[in-house]
Amino acid sequence: YTVMDNTVLTAVPLFLFMGYLVERAGIVSRLFFAIRLASHRLPASMAVAALVTCALFSTATGIIGAVVTLMGLLAWPAMIRAGYDKKFASGVICSGGCLGILIPPSIMLIVYSVIAQLSPLRLFAAAIFPGLLLAGLYIMYAVTLAYFNPSIAPKPPKEDIPPRSEILKEVMVSFLPLFSLIILVLSLIHISEPTRLS
């Protein structure tokens, strides 16, 4: 029971609270639709947007449940309305949600560091590259699958795509708040403990 006395565990509810604030502020939904517009030329552009949003939102919440639940409510209905295959859309949401356990600040890594008596900072540093690599592989798989089988992820109609200037403006405005948070968390991760960081 002495494991629960570890002060590192204080970071868990605080990182969860940070994820809740990001979600309630509407940053994630705006980011998803901005990335969808920016990637409209790619096959499975909505799937790409969902996976990128999952990876970015993982840096604010650190758990699977929050990412899967939010993206399931946000991206899944949008993909189904756009004519995406249900199995493909479900796979994208579930795989993207799993990135939360790898990309810092991962709650799982914090708990594991306490149990295994390892440095949480070293675990965070070790998990960044695999997490981003996994996100990239998911995106490549979704794009390749949709390229060879366009029926599972139809391209959006051209009339639904706004001018390039509007897309650029929307991407900049939606990226700025979350990107600032990501830079802050990842830059301080090497010089501070997770408890202080949270």
Name each region found by the language model:
Residues 1-192, 196-198:
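Alpha-helical transmembrane segments of multi-pass membrane transport proteins
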